[in-house]
């Protein structure tokens, strides 16, 4: 368990440091800023790279909503759920702390939104609580469907991190203007702790919605994605002679 715990810590650290770091330092850098597109790709690349790096050790969750969804789907033991979530939150908080120290090392730097997630007046596009709730549930549900589908035994081995990384990129392209994109309670927690105030007050939504979405995605996958007991749906059957 210690190797898995460390892997989840490192993977979530890299996700927050790379994804939120790109938003904090590079998104609006004068003349050369990477914008929403660059931030979206940064988040996708963090998951892709760490899934290959440590996914073979821990499964590469890096996200409490993913761990909950996989548990609901019967793909992850419930006994390991709390240790995984603890490792993920710790990784996110340590990454946020590192970003904070780096940011405040610049003369005249202001923490601002610090890539925290929010709704209402703290949504990048001014979207309501209901909008934030719906988009986080829907996108996390589809994220779990992609994860469960791409890691299924009938899919060629080795391509899952690519599909999952691209899915997370797409998720960010859709929802950065709405909530700054969470779909990951650990990622939201790390940033909120250093912003304080409104970010902590709104943090509940970025635990509730992704976890609910993850569970929904898992149930949807179990209904249509799993092979039937009597046979292998979608598999090639030998020709009769």
UniProtKB/Swiss-Prot annotation:
Matches recorded under NCBIfam families: MIP, PRK05420.1
Similarity comment: Belongs to the MIP/aquaporin (TC 1.A.8) family.
Catalysed transformations (reactions): H2O(in) = H2O(out)
Superkingdom of the source species: Bacteria
Organism in which the protein naturally occurs: Agrobacterium fabrum (strain C58 / ATCC 33970)
Native organism taxonomy: Bacteria, Pseudomonadati, Pseudomonadota, Alphaproteobacteria, Hyphomicrobiales
Domain notes: Aquaporins contain two tandem repeats each containing three membrane-spanning domains and a pore-forming loop with the signature motif Asn-Pro-Ala (NPA).
GO MF: water channel activity
Mode of membrane association: Multi-pass membrane protein
UniProt xrefs under PROSITE patterns: MIP
Motif NPA 1 location, chain numbering: 63-65
Gene Ontology cellular component annotations, sorted alphabetically: plasma membrane
Location of this chain's protein in the cell: Cell inner membrane
Full protein name: Aquaporin Z 1
Entry-linked HAMAP family: Aquaporin_Z
């Amino acid at each position: 368990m210690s190797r898995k715990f460390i892997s989840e810590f490192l993977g979530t650290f890299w996700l927050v440091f790379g994804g939120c770091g790109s938003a904090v330092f590079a998104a609006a850098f004068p003349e050369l800023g990477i914008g929403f597109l660059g931030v979206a790709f940064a988040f996708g690349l963090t998951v892709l790279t760490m899934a290959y790096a440590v996914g073979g050790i821990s499964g590469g969750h890096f996200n409490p909503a993913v761990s909950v969804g996989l548990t609901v789907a019967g793909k992850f033991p419930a006994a390991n759920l709390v240790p995984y979530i603890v490792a993920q939150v710790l990784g996110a908080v340590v990454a946020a702390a590192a970003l904070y120290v780096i940011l405040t090392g610049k003369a005249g730097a202001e923490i601002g939104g610090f890539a925290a997630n929010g709704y209402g007046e703290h949504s990048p596009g001014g979207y309501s609580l209901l909008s934030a709730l719906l988009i986080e549930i829907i996108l996390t549900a589809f994220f779990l469907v992609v994860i469960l589908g791409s890691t299924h035994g009938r899919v060629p081995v080795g391509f899952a991190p690519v599909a999952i990384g691209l899915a997370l990129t797409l998720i960010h392209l859709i929802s950065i203007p709405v909530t700054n994109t969470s779909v990951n309670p650990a990622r939201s927690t790390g940033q909120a702790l250093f912003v304080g105030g409104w970010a902590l007050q709104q943090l509940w939504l970025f635990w509730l919605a992704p976890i609910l979405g993850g569970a929904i995605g898992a149930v949807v996958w179990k209904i249509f994605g799993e092979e039937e007991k009597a046979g292998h749906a979608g598999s090639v059957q030998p020709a009769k002679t």
